Structures are given as C-alpha cells and as structure tokens.
Amino acid sequence: MFKRTQLIKRELFYWRKALFEYKKIWAYIYYKYIFSKKILDKNEILERPVNNSDLSVHILTCHFDFKMFFWSLASYYNAFKIYGQLYIHNDGTLSPKEINLIKKFFPSARIIDARTFANDFENKLNQYPVFKSIRARHFNFFSFKKIIHTFLAADNKMCLIFDTDILWFKNPIDIEEQIKLGCPRSLMQKNNTYKFLKDGAEIDQQLTQFNAGIILYARENFDTNILIDFFQQLNENNKKELHFADQTGHVKCLKNLSALPEDKYIIRGSVNENTIAKHYTAPRRPLFYLEGILVVMSSRAISEGSQ
C-alpha cells in the first residue's frame, strides 16, 4: 500500500507526462477527475451472470485506483462472452462507500480483504508455510497478494487475473478458446520480466518475455513446489525483486506457458482495429484516460449499461 507522499509524487509524474509528452494536460484533468466518474452514476448492474462455474476471475484494487478498476472490470464484462465467478481483492484501503459501490454494480462478487485474509483463509495458508511467512513479512507488497491470494481464495479449476490498468476492447478469442478447452496452456501477456534472482542468477531467457497484466491458468498447471523454491531464492533486501515477485513467480511456476499475441494484447502503441486489450502500465498511465476509456465508451454496453 502506498503512503500519501508516494501517491502525490506518482500523480505529479502523470501530470508531467500529460503536459510534456502527450501535450494534453487539460484533457487529462477532465477525463480523469470528471469524465471517468460518470461510470459510477449508472443505475444498471455491470456484471453478467456466471456461465462457466470452472472459472474464477480476479482483479486487485485499492482506493487510489478505484475508478480505473471500475472501467477495467466493466470493459471485461463488455468484451468477454465467458464469465466466471468474480473475486475482487481489496488491499485494505477501500472506503465503505467504495465497497457499497462494488456491491451495487457487481452484486455477486466475492470481496477478499487483505487485512482479514490470514484469518479467512487460515487453513489454506497453513498448508503452505512459505507462502504464509513471506506474505506476512512483505504484506505491503502488492505482488504477494496477487500471486498468493488469487491462488488460495478460489477453488475453481481455472483462474483469470488481470490488472486494473488493463482495458478490454474486443472479444479475446485466444483466451476464451483456452477456457473452453480447460486451459491446457497457461497464458500471460508478452513483454519484459525482471530477469535476476539472488546472487545475479538469471531466469531462463525463454521466460523473460512475459508480463503479468493478464494471466490465465488451470490450477493443475500451477506448480506450488516451484513457487516455494522461487520464494526461497528471492533476495528479500532487493525491493525490485519483491515488487516483481508475482510476475516472475507466475513465469516460473506455470506449466505449459505461452505468450498472448503481442499485436493484439498490447502495452505500447495506439489502440487500433486489431487491439483486443491494452495494458496501460505506469509510464503510459495517462493514456488510460486520454485514449482508453474513450474507446471503451464507444461500446453500447458501457455507455448505456449492461442489459
């Protein structure tokens, strides 16, 4: 969880990007602080009924990213045709008002609170002492919540995880085909992975291409023994290793891992007719508001509410 000073510094960074790189500071202010709130004024439920009980869908959020989380999740329901049980992971900073908004728009969602996770899932955590201990030591790191909480919170056969800075624009055929087959292949977005472990040991070069913005796997392809070994190798004095533990950890422990097509699930470049989803990572976060939500709003399901 971020301290207030860190949040202010981060937002100032985005303002500078909007002003000097994108030359759209006033548009950024409008779309982020005024326009983006309109999604919360809808009277319609945004979720769709679960039609695949073998699938769990996970998204982690916090107070700072709350509006972004709403747009990301609404775009998921608009783009997908297969809907699993939704798990919304609260890092502990969501206000009661924000929790009520989640219940209003996503009434069947299961809300997982990081502050009570150790008690709520005590029996499961006790089965994995290494998970339990590293999670407790580094509770403030988002990465351990993402890889541990999502695995333990649900028992569904398949797990889809995506970040709040992902927007979905078209039906993800590649992902849904795997879901229909039971996920014999694990999928992650393609890009850069942090490459080094303790003492400079380098991860297999073949696996450095993955990004954790989008992850799909079958539980049977999640190797807990490999993940335990990975956690035990982490240099816990290196904040960068801790920050990327979910990304590198998934790369290490998922069997039959493949990358999603880079030209369809993009991180860089503008959205075009081939783009299925875009990951608006921190260096390009202002574009979430300057580009992404405008594309999403062109969809009837978002602009008028899910039917």
Each model region followed by its residue ranges:
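N-terminal anchoring/stem segment of glycosyltransferases
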Residues: 2-125, 281-307
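Active-site-proximal specificity loops/subdomain of glycosyltransferases
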Residues: 104-153
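Catalytic core and acceptor-binding pocket of nucleotide-sugar-dependent glycosyltransferases
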Residues: 191-193, 207-287
